[in-house]
């Protein structure tokens, strides 16, 4: 724990209070994902999916077992189907959230299949 170094971008911003911080230049603005309804709708979709397909082990969702082309194709087909249903105006389920879910699944499997070229995403926990 004591071995880490606080990263330094070099540029500083001084606030009216006198507090000084690195600038936010070039950093991801994670607050932006909270704008609009989709983050909550996706979380609701994931919660309902987790009730239907429980975690096979603590901290690992059922969909995270996906690891190959077959699963990637299933995610892709489902994303296309839910997109068409959303565009058609179907309201039998949250098709917009289902598109998010399936695109995320595709990206997850694609990352596993192309680890050397895929952007690396770290777990938050």
Question: PLM ranges: what are they?
Answer:
Residues 1-125:
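Intrinsically disordered, low-complexity regulatory regions
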């Amino acid at each position: 724990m004591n071995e880490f170094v606080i990263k330094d971008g070099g540029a500083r911003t001084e606030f009216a209070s006198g507090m000084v911080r690195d600038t936010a230049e070039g950093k991801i603005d994670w607050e932006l994902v909270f704008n609009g309804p989709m983050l909550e709708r996706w979380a609701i979709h994931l919660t309902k999916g987790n009730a239907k397909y429980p975690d096979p082990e603590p901290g690992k969702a059922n969909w995270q077992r996906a690891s190959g082309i077959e699963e990637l194709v299933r995610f892709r087909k489902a994303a296309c189907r839910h997109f068409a249903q959303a565009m058609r105006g179907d309201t039998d389920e949250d098709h917009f959230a289902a598109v998010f879910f399936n695109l995320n699944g595709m990206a997850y499997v694609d990352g596993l299949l192309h680890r050397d070229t895929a952007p690396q995403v770290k777990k938050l926990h």
